[in-house]
Amino acid sequence: MFKESLEKYGSLNALASRKNGKWEKITFSEYYCLSRKAAKSFLKLGLERFHSVAILGFNSPEWFISAVGAVFAGGIVTGIYTTNSPEACHYIAYDSKTNIMVVENQKLLDKIMQIWNRLPHLKAVVLYRDSILERHPNLYTMEEFLKLGDDICDATLDDIINSQKPNQCCVLIYTSGTTGKPKGAMLSHDNITWTSAHCSRAGDMQPAEVQQESIVSYLPLSHIAAQIYDLWTGIKWGEQVYFAEPDALKGSLINTLKEVQPTSHMGVPRVWEKIMEKLKDASAQSGFVKKKMLSWAMSVSLERNLNCSSSSDLKQFWTRLADYLVLAKIRSALGFSSCQKHFCGAAPLNTETLYFFLGLNITLYEAYGMSETTGPHCLSGPYNYRQHSCGKPVPGCRVKLVNEDTEGNGEICFWGRTVFMGYLNMEDKTKEAFDEDGWLHSGDLGKLDKDGFLYVTGRIKDLIITAGGENVPPIPIEDAVKKELPIVSNAMVIGDKKKFLSMLLTLKCVLDPDTSDPTDILTEQARDFCQKMGSKATTVSEIVATKDQAIYQAIQEGINKVNTNATNRVHCIQKWIVLPRDFSISGGELGPTMKLKRLAVLKKYKNEVDSFYEE
């Protein structure tokens, strides 16, 4: 795949990273040469066939070069989340027989130094951003490392590259392991090359000979969504990848987007929600006229996007005017002036976020898949779109539903070239994942419309089965509460094996710019809500400590409204509590892509949950 791209795109810029305030760029030819140098150095350090190179660090050219070099050398790429504890790093490195670790900085190196003596296969560690403070045997800087393989000839490396087969493993993606040990999903060369070629085209990503796409890389590369979108698809179609700053998710991402003006952008739902909240905060602080203009422009755009087939000439004129006067300026301020495709994946997108961006004339194309399907198995795009749907299966892939209920909801099952090889060292788990006909079971619930568009409706494990045997999908209830109450950040329904439903709530608060941890200070939008309700509170603790009457009454009224629209009484929230701190990655309630970890929340707030059901 890389050789084909090299012939077509060799002179084009491939990777761009900020050094001393300036963008440093390398071409595809330079990228390929550096990857070969890395491969030779991995061989020199003793990388064994089908053993892994584990990479622990934020997205960077060094991450990409190490990953490609590991594959060239016949090894397996294994990404490790920078938020992992030393023990979690040990589990992955031990399980994948890591021979070499590539580590970003001293802080992450310290984690590895704690576990190195318990990793029998680990031969060397490469540090790529910081200089080495204390010398150790087999510890190298990236500059030293890239020179190690200079005496290995091209023919030796070419023999290894040419001996590799499409059905051999080249990438390991470790699932989060919310219900047990993390599972290493083995992805083959064929999985990676097929997905890079066909999923991206289904989303209308262009080859560089038509238009060179530019993207910003910022989501963790140890997650398949970012790795396939940023790294492998980038090689396939000659994209220019700009690397965001490590604090991208703490607020600097928009600065990078404004500078780069990408042609395509992917975010997980929480990223799109954060952008939405930031804009709502900015709107809350603006003057009366600006507020009214934005509200008018967004309502005109939303109506046009929801009823695009039946707009009169006059409505089309108002839409164009709204876009010219207001919306285009907002998209420019977000860094989306040139962005033609906005993707969302890794978790379901709620209606409020979808409609908010349609109001800005930004369509969010949803992707759906899992680590075990090399990322997107179904994808929306400009020519393949329905609201609330994650599109259709990509070429070479199929979807079916099993055990459908009366409303057409069934478990989503996958078949095709994206489907993984199995779990490393877990034959029993691999057998459990597939049925006797070779279909991979997702554990997700969905329905298909008459045209084959897939709609994900929930997760079987998340489905609440009450003490009375009633099935309750929690996400629609949670989304309804968040829509009704703009002060609420996270809402989680409780009720499995219980007599009634209850709910844990957190409030929207400002994040610490250095750590991304939630602070006690309410966001502008939340303070705005408090003022409207007659409360002077500016912090979460003020509201929780005093059970602020105005806010608690407003929350109860909001929940009453949601209950009024419930399918039946079983779907009604009977008790709730406001937690003193919002959910976060560091708090353990959210995963690396900001997905809610329901079991972890239940465990952490066991006392609060138990209090709902005490007789």
Which functions belong to the PLM regions below?
Residues 11-68, 85-90, 141-149, 189:
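Conserved AMP-binding/adenylate-forming core of the ANL superfamily
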Residues 10-13, 147-174, 181, 206-214:
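Conserved pre-ATP/AMP-binding loop-to-beta segment of ANL
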Residues 193-214, 221-329, 338:
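Conserved AMP-binding/adenylation subdomain of ANL enzymes
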Residues 2-26, 133, 577-583:
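AMP-dependent adenylate-forming
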Residues 25-29, 170-197:
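Conserved AMP-binding A3 loop
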Residues 490-492, 556-615:
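Conserved C-terminal "lid"/linker of ANL adenylate-forming enzymes
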Residues 400-402, 406-466:
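Conserved ATP-binding/catalytic segment of the ANL
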Residues 20, 107-166, 279-329:
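ANL superfamily adenylate-forming
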